[in-house]
Regions:
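Bacterial N-terminal signal peptides
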Residues: 1-12
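Central antiparallel beta-sheet cores of small beta-barrel/beta-sandwich binding domains
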Residues: 18-116
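N-terminal, Lys/Arg-enriched amphipathic/low-complexity engagement segments
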Residues: 130-179
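Short, structured beta-strand/loop micro-motifs enriched in basic residues and often containing a Trp
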Residues: 139-148, 180-187, 287-295
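Short, Lys/Arg- and Gly-enriched loop/turn segments at beta-strand edges
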Residues: 170-181, 209-220, 318-328, 417-420
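Intrinsically disordered, low-complexity linker/loop segments enriched in Gly/Pro
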Residues: 208-304
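Conserved mixed alpha/beta catalytic, RNA-binding, or beta-rich assembly cores of soluble enzyme
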Residues: 269-298, 302-379
Length: 443
């Protein structure tokens, strides 16, 4: 099972309970729906997901992703759930005013530690807001440097809504070159997405990424992962700042003060976001905005461009979406430790895929699906990307392990997306034309 810690100020239990109570049910108790469970683990509040399906007095569904079976007798609930590692959860609770409260016992047959019992309450995830999608114009005044659930949301939006905003560059400078915040990939957000709950997937459709100034900062440094001993010696004197001119009329970037052999060197502009993230699971300390992981973060993947969709696993209510670290262009791996760092004009549309559990970040373009692996070494990132894509093919295309192996063995394209940061990044791409003959069933 997965544990999700969320500070009290962001649990929004009152607002969720009020939304649920608007549809309060007279007469017989019914509990079908998606619930957010708030449990106390030895003094630490944690967050879990629960989905209940009721047929008469019989209950089925999932508790933090584990299949459950149980009963509803009057207003009393009892169910048991089990995971694939012999972990079990047994729940006894009471329903009152659209709130479920009780205890859950966690145990594992293979663990010598005795079972632990924890009190919890659960509230219904509200339904989507009625009416057409909205468009939001948001001008940021505060920028955060952690992908934290403790940061106050700057704006509340609904699935289907579009947000138009801007980002500062990695050093904290805005479109006028004015320092607005300490550097280190300061982020715009977080945006609270209504109905997003632990166990869901947030889809971020990047509808517009445009440069809003004519220069970018970078350097001539080379990251250690890219250097053998001989090249490291040759590169011992590099590390100077390099400023680039961004010519949006011709769509190219050039060094403002080019070295002798780079006087005619140009790079095509391809605006991208180095950071797209949801708030991390705060069972551990919130990661800084230079880090990456299951929550996305500083992925520095150069195909997170206009027209792409980024998928991220939700760990906290509202997802708490962050965007930032705009790049005018970047080669694979971000080998300089920086790309062409610049501020950005950004527009995106958000959506929520309820109950869709993915193991890590994913990206989709008009031509490819792309699974991201982010780990401490390139080898481990390679494995993580492969596992992420295997899950995608299994869940969406219903492929068997043998079929997954055949597809990957004939169609996998791997890219080194990130070599500069604590976590390395590998992306496994598959051209969707290869998958058309085995397209998933229509939903």
């Amino acid at each position: 099972f997965l544990l999700f810690l969320v500070p009290g100020l962001l649990l929004s239990p009152d607002s969720w309970a009020q939304d649920a109570q608007k549809g309060a049910r007279p007469g017989k108790v019914t509990v079908s729906g998606r619930w957010v469970v708030r449990a106390d683990f030895f003094g630490t509040p944690i967050q879990l997901s629960m989905e209940l399906k009721q047929e008469g007095d019989k209950l089925t569904g999932e508790f933090s992703g584990d299949k459950l079976e149980g009963t509803l007798t009057g207003n009393s609930i009892h169910f048991a759930a089990k995971d694939e590692q012999n972990g079990t959860e047994e729940c006894d609770a009471t329903v009152k005013d659209d709130t479920i409260s009780g205890t859950v016992v966690f145990a594992n047959a293979d663990d010598p530690e005795p079972p632990s019992t924890h009190k919890f309450t659960a509230t219904l995830v509200p339904e989507r807001r009625p009416g057409p999608p909205r468009r939001h114009e948001f001008t940021p005044t505060t920028f955060y440097r952690q992908f934290s659930a403790a940061n106050k949301p700057v704006l509340t939006v609904s699935p289907g809504d579009t947000i138009h905003t801007s980002t500062v560059d990695a050093g904290g400078k805005d479109e006028k070159g004015i320092s607005r915040v300490l550097g280190g990939n300061p982020e715009t957000g977080p945006f609270y997405v209504e109905t997003a709950a632990p166990g869901d997937t947030l889809a971020v459709h990047l509808t517009r990424l445009r440069l809003n100034r004519d220069w970018a900062g970078s350097d001539d440094y080379m990251v250690g992962r890219a250097l053998d001993s001989d090249l490291a010696v040759k590169m011992k004197d590099v590390g100077k700042s390099i400023r680039w001119h961004l010519d949006t009329e011709h769509g190219v970037a050039t060094p403002e003060k080019p070295a002798e052999h780079l006087t005619r060197y140009t790079v095509p502009l391809r605006p991208m976001l180095g950071c797209v993230a949801v708030a991390s699971n705060l069972a551990q300390a919130a990661p800084g905005t230079g880090d990456s992981g299951r929550y996305g973060g500083n992925m520095d993947f150069n195909e997170v461009v206009e027209g792409a969709t980024v998928y991220l696993p939700v760990s906290v209510p509202g997802a708490l979406l962050y965007v930032g670290d705009g790049h005018a262009a970047q080669g694979d791996g971000e080998l300089n430790g920086n790309a062409l760092e610049t501020s950005m004009d950004v527009e995106f549309t958000v959506d929520v895929i309820p109950g869709k559990r993915i193991m890590g970040p994913r990206v989709a373009s008009a031509t490819h699906i792309m699974a991201v692996g982010l780990e401490g070494s390139l080898d481990d990132a390679f494995r993580a990307a492969t596992a992420n894509m295997a899950q995608w093919l299994t869940d969406e295309y219903k492929l068997t392990p043998s079929e997954v192996a055949q597809v990957l063995g004939t169609s996998a394209e791997y890219k080194v997306s990130e070599a500069a940061d604590r976590n390395a990044g590998i992306v496994l791409k598959i051209n969707t034309e290869r998958l058309h003959p085995i397209a998933p069933p229509a939903k």
